[in-house]
Amino acid sequence: ANVSFSLSGADSKSYSKFITALRKALPSKEKVSNIPLLLPSASGASRYILMQLSNYDAKAITMAIDVTNVYIMGYLVNSTSYFANESDAKLASQYVFKGSTLVTIPYSGNYERLQNAAGKIREKIPLGFRALDSALTSIFHYDSTAAAAAFLVILQTTAEASRFKYIEGQIIERIPKNEVPSPAALSLENEAWSLLSKQIQLAQTNNGAFRTPVVIIDNKGQRVEITNLASKVQIKDVNSKLLLNKQNIA
């Protein structure tokens, strides 16, 4: 695997080290406003990196991540691989986990479909190290409904934390006790990454101003407009994005 994280003996330092390693494992050729810009495209096996996660019992799961958008395409448990029911994941299955027995999960990996499959919304699903342990255990012993809820925990603890320093901090706060995500974290996960990525890139040729303001929710549940690169968002650190998605420039 390119990056790995084990819950056994983990603390805030080892988790932060893992998230930093995950960011570094995602290739970037340029920066915009000092934020790494992910590749617009990649082909073949070079489009994916592998991330290994282990629960407290040292049961390991390996996940394949698309380097252009930090989406999890599928995962490997022992000799069985599981891929989301979508075209990008089918493509990934041609390049990663070769020789494994392939199972198609009956839903795609976006939040709405995962929430439908899980029968739960993210607002009600706690995050934290114990939540991550339960999620990894659920995925290890595959059950499609439990796996959907587990995926929601894993996505936020890994991919979203790598995109936003703020979300990484939110997970660290939840290490000692499970707690549902903050309104600000959920707001950032809901399209804000794509919208902010696009506007930050467009602002380069617009004197630092966004062409379209991006509205996010702060920790108190209030709407906040980000209008330019210098916007000091009321939520501490919420706009310290650490990765940008190149695909969203139009």
UniProtKB/Swiss-Prot annotation:
- Reaction(s) the record says it catalyses: Endohydrolysis of the N-glycosidic bond at one specific adenosine on the 28S rRNA
Recorded superkingdom? Eukaryota
EC no. given is 3.2.2.22
Keyword tags: Antiviral defense, Hydrolase, Plant defense, Protein synthesis inhibitor, Toxin
InterPro entries noted in UniProt: Ribosome-inact_prot_sf (IPR036041), Ribosome_inactivat_1/2 (IPR017989), Ribosome_inactivat_prot (IPR001574), Ribosome_inactivat_prot_CS (IPR017988), Ribosome_inactivat_prot_sub1 (IPR016138), Ribosome_inactivat_prot_sub2 (IPR016139)
Listed GO molecular functions?
rRNA N-glycosylase activity; toxin activity
The kind of enzyme this is, by top-level EC class, is: hydrolase
The record's active-site residues are 160
Alphabetical GO biological process terms: defense response to virus; negative regulation of translation
Family according to the record = Belongs to the ribosome-inactivating protein family. Type 1 RIP subfamily.
Q: What is this protein called?
A: Ribosome-inactivating protein luffin-B
Q: Which organism is it from?
A: Luffa aegyptiaca
